[in-house]
Amino acid sequence: MNCQNKILNSVTVVYGYSSGDFSWKNNDDRKIFRTSGLIASIEGKKYVVTTREQMISCKTLIMYHLFKKNGVLVKSYMHILFQSIENNLIILGSVGYNELILDKDNAVSTTLNQKEIEIILNKFKGTNLDSHQTIPTNRSLYHINKIDLGNTFDNIKYKYHTYDIKFNKQCIFDKSYLPKSLKYKFICQKNINSVGTLGTVVYSAKNKIIGITTHVGTNKIYVTPTTVIISMMRNFIDYFNDQQSYKGQSCFPFKLKIDESNNIIITMQKNKSNKKVPVKNGDMLRTLNGYEIIVNDNEACLCVDSKNIIPLDIYFRMKYQKDASYELTVSRGSKIVKFNLFLVSNTSELRLTDQTYYFPKDTIPHINLFGLIVVKLSHELIDYLVKNGIIVRNYVIENIMNGAELNDDILIILDSTNELNCTTFNFPILTKQTKPIDCPVLTSLNHQKISNLENLSNVKLFTKGENILTLKLNQDSEIDLLV
């Protein structure tokens, strides 16, 4: 796919209507979120790229877009086509389609006059999203554009704001339980209302797109670079006809450790899956795709140049392509050995998410097992809970915190809607509180081992009687649950 065909030619505004992250609860705390977005043309089809933050929990998404030629404002109901949990981005299309359909028949009225429309449309001109990474500098001028709408949707007051921002540094963003990511940090020249700032496009005075805002702090914004956006969009297109094979974040089929001399040493675990991998224990990693591998902050990093040092896991996300191999150079004793490797799914660490990457439906996928809310343990689940002021614990989480690796997916009981069973067996109730909530691991149901939500629907129920379930929790003995 030719990346130069990706024409990013319009900014837009997206509203999301959410009733909370925990869909099994009767929650009347409905919220409205607003974010900006970027319309991208790829291989003849249009999509909206925006931040995943907040939007992922919204059941209803509505986009408003102003046509450049005639100032017509259209309204379009949207749905999520693809999500990149690692990069906090999503791709949207119109409801009923796998792309964005801009229908002028859905035009809505505005309070704008022709002069105001011309001012707005001249603010931002179409530009190409280059296939290479453009690193901003302290010498150049940058700004973002943000769209505001009025409070009533039958007569919309459309406002277009431009804010000047100053580049601060390229940094590794690690402020959540999700994987760290590479971002550009910008300082705002004046206070910016955080509402609607997520998803805004950052571009230079020469109309060069730098990236999309995916995190907002006090008087500062963090921007995901264009090369990451391109990688996500390429994955969306390349895997669309083979969605189950897309696994998100990938890694080498071996681990790396750093010795006292700052050598990067390859370590291999013996198993059937890596018998054909040409590396050996003790090999020292030297280069990747021709770039030197160095140690920076006790981490193996790819050194593009002195100003662009990228941790390897982040580099893979930025440059990942389907069926692409990576050229490695290693030192093996007195020899220099070169070979090509493919990335593999990372299965020895806590699962990143239990959501699907294509067409996600639930913020937290779950099974309601007769009043017990069963979910799969993941980085994303922990991140959601922490953001909602909830800390959960069990022996698996404690083991992970102590550096243990996982070989199986883990199911936990996150919540209970049956007050009697909750009192009898001390099942958790999901609420904000200062103390951690004990959420037991569900290891078997009716004597059958389970490790994913799909297993629950395949287990034969009521083996001891018409209304009895046998559960094994944590590493304890079994209990019989009356349902």
From Swiss-Prot:
Highest taxon listed in the record's lineage: Viruses
Name of the protein in question: Uncharacterized protein R367
Source organism phylogeny: Viruses, Varidnaviria, Bamfordvirae, Nucleocytoviricota, Megaviricetes
